[in-house]
């Protein structure tokens, strides 16, 4: 019998909680396509900036996302290289499961027209975390 260490169990709980929300799955669906800033997520999902920020922060904290700064923008992407192998398996299964969903397809279509030059980006509210806050 294989016993899962307590720390791994806590990480797994955080991961499954992150995946247990439709909005977070919709954001992952976008990030499977390309890296995004908060305002692109906001536009593609037709949600508020604060909700997009909270979702990205939750997915980042669960270990799914990487972050890089580019001028005004904090750009989020799936962090395939820094991810634990079991997380990669979970995300691949999630990606396959979302592929044919009508809502997910519509979100991906809206992402194609989302722009990084929106009001959220212009006032620098596009990023949730900065490189400095991640390093702390």
Task: State where each predicted segment sits.
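C-terminal regulatory/oligomerization modules of transcriptional regulators
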Residues: 1-8, 82-136
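Beta-hairpin "wing" of winged helix-turn-helix
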Residues: 61-70, 77
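Alpha-helical interaction segments
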Residues: 5-6, 50, 63-67
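N-terminal helix-turn-helix DNA-binding core of bacterial DNA-binding proteins
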Residues: 10-51, 73-82
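Residues within the DNA-recognition helix of helix-turn-helix
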Residues: 55
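A general structural signal for well-ordered secondary-structure junctions
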Residues: 22-25, 37, 65, 104, ...
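Alpha-helical residues within the helix-turn-helix
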Residues: 43, 60-61
């Amino acid at each position: 019998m294989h016993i899962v260490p307590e720390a791994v169990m806590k990480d797994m709980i955080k991961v499954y909680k992150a995946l247990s929300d439709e909005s977070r799955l919709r954001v992952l669906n976008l990030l499977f396509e390309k890296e995004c800033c908060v305002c692109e997520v906001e536009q593609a999902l037709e949600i508020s900036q604060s909700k997009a920020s909270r979702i990205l922060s939750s997915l980042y904290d669960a270990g799914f996302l990487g972050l890089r700064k580019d001028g005004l923008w904090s750009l989020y992407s799936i962090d395939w290289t820094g991810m634990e192998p079991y997380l990669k398996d979970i995300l691949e299964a999630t990606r396959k499961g979302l592929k044919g969903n009508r809502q997910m397809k519509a979100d991906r279509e809206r992402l194609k027209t989302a722009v990084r030059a929106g009001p959220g980006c212009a006032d620098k509210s596009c990023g949730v975390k900065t490189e400095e806050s991640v390093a702390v």
